[in-house]
């Protein structure tokens, strides 16, 4: 917090709107309004409670929040993450990838309620129907490399390490289909216009995070 204070920021756009960032506001700008701290609370519509507003899709909330701060939101409602893609020919050739289904069976250690436990069952069902038409792959993060061995899928690494965000974007973009828990790669897939399915638990709804 001391390091943040040293920068003497004059405007903060809080798009996470979490209990953690709310705590930051109380410490850094305890009496701040919209002019200093832009959040879902400081830009809350007059006719809605915070609880009601938070039920709206996240992009709708971002759009309202930024517009309330005078920012043009040309791309907010239609994000395109394809700019992040890079050439992954080396990886594609190394793993002989052509038609593949990309799986993201992982989740944050403290959010295990997001983890769907039937990915191997799904792989077996698809293999039974489509035989060898598709390869199944995972692209684990740095702390998920060992966990990836639990799944009947090829573990994609770059020189023994987790692929970069840009490489991951390209793997998603080139995939035949994506199946993911409610994690970062699922949102990347949505904004890369990839075909796929995200599995949501009882913690949220597809509409709320769409």
Predicted regions and their residues:
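Catalytic machinery of carbohydrate-active enzymes
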Residues: 1-210
